[in-house]
């Protein structure tokens, strides 16, 4: 929150990457996943802040129930349980999807900061990898816990939140580079205009008249 407010204060005077919202974990898990591990990953996000979002999409009521029970069990011994429980109660969600396509549609619509595919290697996991494309970072496999990306594996930790992954990626040097463009026109050796310039003049003139900007059209000619 403090970093976000600092960015708001300097925005317009200095370049920033993005205004980040609460941290997000979005997990797609099937019956091959360990409910205890899935619950641990959800709580790892929930303990950050009461506004943190932990979402699980799975495919059976039985697995959803197992994860829910594990969350309650782990909260009992979690030192940060007060914050984590408020986060789970406020923003935690377990969704039962009827198919991989539905699960991917939900994920792409959410465009989460962190997307985990807690599934065995195989056709279903490959299919989800192909269907999902809106996320900050993708974590593939049962052992690919989001915390490894944050702390140890070297992945980008400054990622888009609040749906921004639909149109941008994580922080990179490119965000602090400035792009400028240049237009130069030249004549042929006989003093005539090059064909490209002629076409540009005609196009600009037509658009100027179409928009009712006569001076623009005249300037083109």
Where are these regions (language model features)?
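A glycine- and small/hydrophobic-rich beta-loop-beta segment
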Residues: 48, 52, 56-135
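Conserved NAD(P)+-binding/catalytic subdomain of aldehyde/semialdehyde dehydrogenases
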Residues: 1-53
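Short, glycine-/Ser/Thr-/acidic-enriched flexible segments
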Residues: 1-2, 32-34, 61-62, 100-102, ...
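Structural motif
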Residues: 1, 17, 24-27, 53-55, ...
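C-terminal segments
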Residues: 130-221
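Structural signal for hydrophobic packing residues in well-ordered secondary-structure cores
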Residues: 6-14, 33, 46-50, 67-79, ...
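Electropositive phosphate-/nucleotide-binding environments in soluble metabolic enzymes
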Residues: 19, 32, 36-40, 57, ...
């Amino acid at each position: 929150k403090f970093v976000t407010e600092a960015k708001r204060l300097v925005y317009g005077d200095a370049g920033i990457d993005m205004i980040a919202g609460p941290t997000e974990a979005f997990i797609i898990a099937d019956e091959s996943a360990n409910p205890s591990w899935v619950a641990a990953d959800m709580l790892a996000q929930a303990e950050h802040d009461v506004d943190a979002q932990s979402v699980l999409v799975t495919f059976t009521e039985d697995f959803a129930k197992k994860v829910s029970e594990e969350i309650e069990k782990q909260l009992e011994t979690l030192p940060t349980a007060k914050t984590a429980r408020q986060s789970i109660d406020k923003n935690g969600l377990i969704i039962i999807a009827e198919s991989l396509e539905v699960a991917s549609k939900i994920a792409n619509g959410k465009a989460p900061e962190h997307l985990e595919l807690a599934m065995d290697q195989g056709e279903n996991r490959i299919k989800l990898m192909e269907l999902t494309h809106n996320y900050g970072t993708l974590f593939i496999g049962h052992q690919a816990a989001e915390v490894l990306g944050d702390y140890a594996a070297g992945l980008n930790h400054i990622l888009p939140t609040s749906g921004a992954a639909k149109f941008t990626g994580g922080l990179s040097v490119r965000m602090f580079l400035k792009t400028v463009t240049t237009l130069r026109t030249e004549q042929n050796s006989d003093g005539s205009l090059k064909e490209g310039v002629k076409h540009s003049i005609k196009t600009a003139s037509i658009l100027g008249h179409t928009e009712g900007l006569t001076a623009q059209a005249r300037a083109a000619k």
